[in-house]
Design a protein with these regions (language model features):
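Sec-dependent bacterial lipoprotein signal peptides
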Residues: 1-17
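Bacterial Sec-dependent N-terminal signal peptides
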Residues: 16-34
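Sequence contexts marking disulfide-bonded cysteines in secreted/extracellular proteins
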Residues: 19, 33-38, 83-85, 116-118
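Short, surface-exposed beta-strand/strand-loop-strand elements in extracellular ectodomains
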Residues: 38-49, 92-103
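Short strand-edge motifs at loop-to-beta-strand transitions and within beta-strands
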Residues: 61, 65-71, 120-122
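A short, solvent-exposed beta-strand micro-motif common in secreted/extracellular proteins
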Residues: 75-88
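C-terminal partner/receptor-binding element of secreted or periplasmic proteins
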Residues: 105-127
Length: 127
């Protein structure tokens, strides 16, 4: 009778000590401004979130579209945020601007109209 009780207690103690510690999560707000761009964003190894920013021409003004996105990151993950022009000749309609803020130190990246893609791909500093 004593051995099974000791065995069960030992298993309970081992199971509770093996509990996986959860990593702290951080919220990050992303913003991309571009004319006719494909936006891709993720944290860590995942690269599967996409959006398209169209923009439009109104009279003699070119209006770039802005997309905002929310991302949840863990401490050891890198931020991946990219916007690439769908049509190479759409560069004449303005720069590509990328920014990230929230529970991280703010990041801003802009590329001139001649560039095809703007990319942020790096480790971030959490607050």
């Amino acid at each position: 009778m004593f051995r099974p009780v000791v065995g069960v207690l030992a298993l309970l103690i081992l199971a509770s000590s093996c509990k996986k510690e959860e990593a702290k999560q951080y919220k990050v707000s992303l913003r991309a401004t571009c004319f006719d761009c494909l936006v891709q964003y993720a944290s860590g190894p995942d690269r599967g979130r996409y959006d398209t920013l169209a923009g439009f021409v109104e009279g003699t003004d070119t209006i770039r579209e802005t997309g905002t996105y929310e991302l949840v990151m863990k401490q050891d993950e890198a931020l991946f945020f990219r916007a690439c022009r769908i049509w190479p000749d759409s560069g004449s309609f303005g720069d590509i601007e990328l920014s990230a803020e929230g529970d991280i130190e703010p990041i801003y990246h802009a590329v001139p109209a001649q560039e095809v893609c703007g990319v942020i791909n790096r480790e971030v500093q959490f607050r």
